Every structure is written in C-alpha cells, then in structure tokens.
Amino acid sequence: MSAVYTLASRPPRPLVPPSYVNPAQMQNAQAGPSTAPSGPKKKSSPTLATVKRKRTDTPEGNSPGSPSPQPQRKGREGPKKKKANRACFHCQKAHLTCDDSRPCQRCVKRGLASNCTEGHRKKAKYLLDEEELEQLKRSKSSAPEIQGNVSAANTADPPSVPIAEPFPQNDSLLTASFDPNFSFGSEAANREYSILSAILGNPSPPESASTPPPPPPPPQSYATWTSDAIDFIGSPRLGTATSSYTSPYGESMQADTTLSTSPGNAHYLTYPYPQSQRSEDLVDMSYASQYSSAGQGQPCLPANSRPRSPPTVFLHNPSSKDQGSRGLLSPPPSNGSPSSTSSAPSGIAEIVRPQSCGSQLQSINDRVLTPYDYTEGYHFLMKHLPTRFEKNDILRIVRALAIFRPSLIALQMPLSLDDEVFVEKCFQRSLVELDKLMSFSGTPTVVWRRTGEICLVAPEFCMLTEWPMEDLVHQKKYIYELFENQSVVEYWENFASHAFENTTQSVYSHCVLLKPSGAPVPSTFCFSIRRDLFDLPSIVIGQWLPLL
C-alpha cells in the first residue's frame, strides 16, 4: 500500500514527443555544438545539373529560345577544286583559279577552248640567263620599229611631209649590253653607266648624200669641233660614249692609243676653264675661232670622206705644267695631217695612256717607297716665322704648336717604317679622290698637309688669288705663306684646338689672302681636318669665298 501511495503522490511529468534523428546525419555528424544551424540549407537539384550538361543541337549563335534561328549552312557539294600548278593564259590574266586540264573548265564554259594555252610566268630579271636577257631586249627593241612601220603605212599626210624613219634597232638604249670594262663592282651599275653612255653618245640616224646639211648648231655644240675630234668620238672603237658627261671615274679610266675603248674606258670630261689658259697654250687650237665659226655653219661630210688622224686624248697629268686644265678635255688640232698631233705644244697637256683605277693605284704603290718627312715642314716654319712676324705673334704660334705636337710625337713613336709608308700611300690615294671631288665644285679649294704644304689646288683658287698653279704645286709652297699675318696666327690656333676633335665638323673663320703683288683678298674661310688610320691629322681641306 505504501508503494502505491508513493507513486500516486508524485506529480505527473510532461510528455515530450521523441525527436526524429536522420541516420544519414548521424553518419556525417561532427564534434561541436549540439544545436543545428538555424539557416535553411539549399539542396542541389539534380534537374539543374542535367540542364547544364545538356547540349543543344542548334547552330552557334542561336539559343534555343531565340525567336528567329538562322538556317543551317549547306555543305559544299562535290570535291574541293584543286589549284593548278600553272594557270592558262586567260585565267592568269583574269586572276581566276584554273585546273590542270587543257582546255580548262573555265575556258570551255567561256567558249575559249581553242585558245586555252599555258600562261607565261614572268621571271625576275636578275634570274634571267644571258640568252633570255638578250631575247627580252630584242623583243622590246623591235616594238618601236613595228609601231613606226604601222604609222608610216597608215598615215594620210601629203607626200611633202617627211615620214619619220623607224628607230634603228642598233641605236636602241635597250641594246646597250653589259660592258665588263666598267669597274663599278656591280653588274647593275655597269649596265646603268652603259645606258647613260648610250644616251649621251648615240649619233643621229644616217642621212643620204643628197640630204642638205642641217642648220648650224648652237655655239657649244660638237659640230664646232674639228673633223679629227668628231671621228675620234664617233669611231666604232670608242663605242657610243662621248666626252660631255662628267664622271667621277673620268680621270682614272684613260684610253689607250689603240683605243679599244667602249663606254667603259670612255673619258667623261668637260671643257677647260678659259680663264686659266695662257696665250701659248692656245697655239693651233684657238677656241675663239672655233666658236665664232659655229655661226657660219660647217658642212657635214661623210665619215669616210673626212681626213683622219690618229685619235689622241689630251688629259691632265699631275706632272705637267698646265694645271689649269686638270681633268679636262682639249680637242686636238684642226688640221688633218697625221703629224699635227706631234706638233702640238707640250705646255698644253701630255698625251696620257689609258689607265684604269686599279693601275693608277698600283702606280701609287710602286712610287711610294719611303715615308714622308714631316719634320722638314716644321723646320721651314721655324725659319719662316722670324722673317715675317713680331715676337708676340711668334709666341702665339709656338704655343699653338706646343698644344698638338706632343700628341703627334706620341702617336708616331710606335709606328714602324712599313706603317709610315702605308700612311703615305693612303694619303696619296686620298688625294686622287679629292682631285675628282674638286673637279665637281666651283668653290676655291686647296688641300694641304698638316705641316701646311700645298698638295692640290683648284683653278678657282688661282683665279681668286692670281697665283699661278705651277708656283703653288710644283715649288713646295706652304698655305700660311698666302695668308696675312693675323690670319696665320688664327689658323694655327684653330688648328691646334681642332686637330684631335671631331673630324665631321669644320672650322669657320675670317681670312685675308695675299696676291703675288701683296694685295689683300678678304674672304671667309673654312677648313676641315681628316685623320689617318692611326688617328694622326693627315689632310686639311680649306675653302674660301671672297667678301664682296
């Protein structure tokens, strides 16, 4: 009874429904708080994953929901057309795709099956053989001849109007073949100079004996030359070259007396300066009488009826006395006797045998055997200073010499005898190039050594200062002897400050030149210094312009 009473006296406990536990969560349970996260957890839907992996069969760019899907492209029917190795002439001209069959399908469709032939593939000129190149030139040169014949046959002009003769094939510029005598190192350059020679030297078409002589040409025409000069220029041994074209290689390429001179050995020279010629130089070849006779007209004789004399080229020689006609052509005497060439005065020029550029350089190598003595020039300067200058000017010049002379001595000490000979050969070769450049310029120019010894003189400088060419070149004249005292001091000071500076820059200053009579010639003066292989000041190039 007591036990039943005890159970009845206890208050009833509230009933809590048991919580449901998922077995899967129990397996994945981890250590941590017993409370579950309050936020709802998203469940991955399997349908979405299948949608992402699903591929549509629609073409690119068209989504399944696009309102206007594009139609699918139709595949190309038949096999792909293969390009031919070489197109036919019509397809090549129209830039269309051809096939290997002849006639090709395009020509069959266009009704050109009978004319379907292999197209001509153009080949680069530098890949052509000599035979192909000659054939190309002949085909091009025959075109003007055919056109001339057609125009002559179809013309309706009255008979009084002369019909132009067809252009001769042998005079065509395209037939100017490659001449190996040109020493330019390139076949293209050689051919270009051959064509230039043909342009300048092609004679006019042959005329019959009944044709009246042409009107007299202008004063500076070649008709004013003597018959010997015309024969010399127009001779087949000279080729098509003439002497009116100035070439930088004119002085180095000289013709032999046998004159196997094609355009390669032709001398492209100009007329001499009339101011630099003396009266004794004009014996038997007066230009004034020839120019005056141009207005009267000279009959043009056939080539076989003119008196001939041995062809002779009168060129400048550095050892000749007349330096005024340097690198210039002088026509031979006017009389036709063979002995006229030997009777020409020796003061005009010397008959020079043709010399190529290589032979001229070879002569320099054979002639220069010892180095140049520069100490002699400085010794002359030391003797010359007390005779002209005061003590203050002498001190300024000596100070200027003391600036660069130690550097010269230091650079010359390690040089051997062969090195000094090589430097002198380079100096002589530079003079050859400078002589060519001076012939193209009309500016008074002088080239001298670092000691002041004059090496080259332009004729314009002689006209400016009235100094004879022989006195300046052949008598070992120094450039400072032609300067006024103050100009000498300024020159040596400028030379000392720029002797070892940038050789691409020039020094500009004022200079007063002295004539042989002592009259001053105020001028502007610029000079540049060239150094040799061993960095020694070697060549000084000076130019003047008079102050008017």
Swiss-Prot record:
It holds the Pfam family Zn_clus. Gene3D superfamilies: Zn(2)-C6 fungal-type DNA-binding domain. SMART domains: GAL4. Keywords: Activator, DNA-binding, Gluconeogenesis, Metal-binding, Nucleus, Transcription, Transcription regulation, Zinc. GO terms for biological process: cellular response to starvation; gluconeogenesis. The keyword Transcription regulation applies. GO terms for cellular component: nucleus. Its main location: nucleus. Residues 203-220 have a biased composition (Pro residues). InterPro entries: ERT1_acuK_gluconeogen_tf, PAS_13, Zn2-C6_fun-type_DNA-bd_sf, Zn2Cys6_DnaBD. Residues 1-86, 138-168, 196-261, 290-346 are annotated as: Disordered. Residues 88-116 bind DNA. Residues 336-346 have a biased composition (Low complexity). It is found in: Nucleus. PROSITE patterns: ZN2_CY6_FUNGAL_2. CDD domains: GAL4. GO terms for molecular function: DNA-binding transcription factor activity, RNA polymerase II-specific; RNA polymerase II transcription regulatory region sequence-specific DNA binding; zinc ion binding. Residues 22-37, 141-154, 240-261 have a biased composition (Polar residues). PANTHER family: TRANSCRIPTION ACTIVATOR OF GLUCONEOGENESIS ERT1, ZN(II)2CYS6 TRANSCRIPTION FACTOR (EUROFUNG)-RELATED. Transcription factor which regulates nonfermentable carbon utilization. Activator of gluconeogenetic genes. Belongs to the ERT1/acuK family. This is Transcription activator of gluconeogenesis ERT1.
